Amino acid sequence: MTRSRILFICSVLFVCSSAIAQRVPIPQQLTFTPYHSNGIYKIGETVGWTVTPGPDAPTYAYKWTVRRNNAVVLEEGKLDLSSGKDKIEIVGDQPEMIYVAIEPYAALAAAPTAPSASGTSAGQSGSASPNQNSQTPDAASTAAAQSGSTAGNPGGSPQPPQWIGGNTGRNNGLYAVGAAVAPTEIRLSTPRPVDFDAFWDGKLALQATVPLDAVITPVPTDVPGVEMSMFALDALGSKAHGYIARPVAEGKYPALILLQYAGVYALNKHPDAEHAADGWLVLNVDSHDKLPSDPSGGIPANYNAVGNTDREKSYFLDMYLRDSRVLDYLATRQDWDGKTVVLTGGSMGGQQSIVLAGLRPDKVTDVLVCVPAGADTNGDLHGRKAGYPYWPSDNQDAMNAALYFDTVNFASRIKAPVMAGFGFIDTVSPPAGVWTMLNQIPGPKEPVPVIDSEHDNYTYMKMEPCHARTRDILDLLVKGGVYTPKELQP
């Protein structure tokens, strides 16, 4: 992939929405230096950070709260930075994620000053994979908070947000740090349903009786040497939709399947064409039963809550089956090389990638995901903070149904090598769940832990290690190389 193409993708295609304005740089007020630079500790070791204030740090005191798996409070304390530094420490006594929330005791300044031009570079809100263009959960509220407001401004131009600070990407004055204790030993919080495989094998068998009835419609592209189409496929109870991009030249190409972030939106087909120009046969799959060019399609914004108390009615049942249907269609194409199928996506796109690799283990060759959602959905019942899709833990029917759509229960079926990047302070795709999912995969996998990152719609640039690793692996695979996951460094 050319440098210009990489820069274009990074600067344009990862932006969640054109409505999100460039964020104002925010100087770092507090710096947290972990005792272990990779944030990973053994059981019995002291987990800790040295905290130093920056030149613009407020003088008020900070309270810190240590939580196991961001759920169970273990210890609280106060930062005293009067000497120029302080520390936060706790001993990890079991396989777990440590989440530390740091907040000021005193009220934040009533009228915060604007940041100086020497602050950190502005981040972007966007995807963890090469194709995404949508908002992740809560991205809209984040954008509103960080891109300014037109309220009280008749001209309608956004006003700069007030500078409050913090490191979680929310500009709310709060900080968080995270660490992992023996993370490769984190196990399932809830047993896998005994009929899990029978349930999904039955659904796939039923879908196999439905004719594909593929409808392929050419669409324009401005990328030279590439042709594009829109597809619609009959699935079990719904239709799968998306875009296809391929090189114009006749040949057989490796397949790249792009799965989408949470939200309802029109797909951006330009990155599909860019990947096709690199030599991929690309299928970009809409998460919903709607035309990929349609920004809404009548899909409810709270689709993740639809049917969430019944595995037969869950919105994610049809979503996962549509994803599988795309592989059925791929097998009919004469321009596919007949062997390579790479799945990639971020957040809910990562969730779908893991699920599809588990549903169709003999068809998928590689899985590359960042901040994958949908893991450990019952975590709230067992001392682990659960994340998206945010199924209600106070509803036992919802918790029972969730297990059939949880990535941790698909992971044991996966045969392909998996690369997964995730943040240690992510509250949308909590890291304890991602570790749990990875630990269920029997084959090779490559964790890419990013110790200082929230979900990447909040702290996009911090997730660059995963974005960069994805690009490198794709460049290897499109040239016919073989991806071998790197082992976790101690």
Language-model region placement:
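Short beta-strand element of the alpha/beta-hydrolase
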Residues: 244-246, 252-262
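Hydrolase active-site cap/lid region
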Residues: 350-397, 449
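C-terminal catalytic histidine-bearing segment of alpha/beta-hydrolase fold enzymes
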Residues: 393, 435-490
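Short beta-strand/loop motif that positions the catalytic acidic residue
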Residues: 414, 420-422
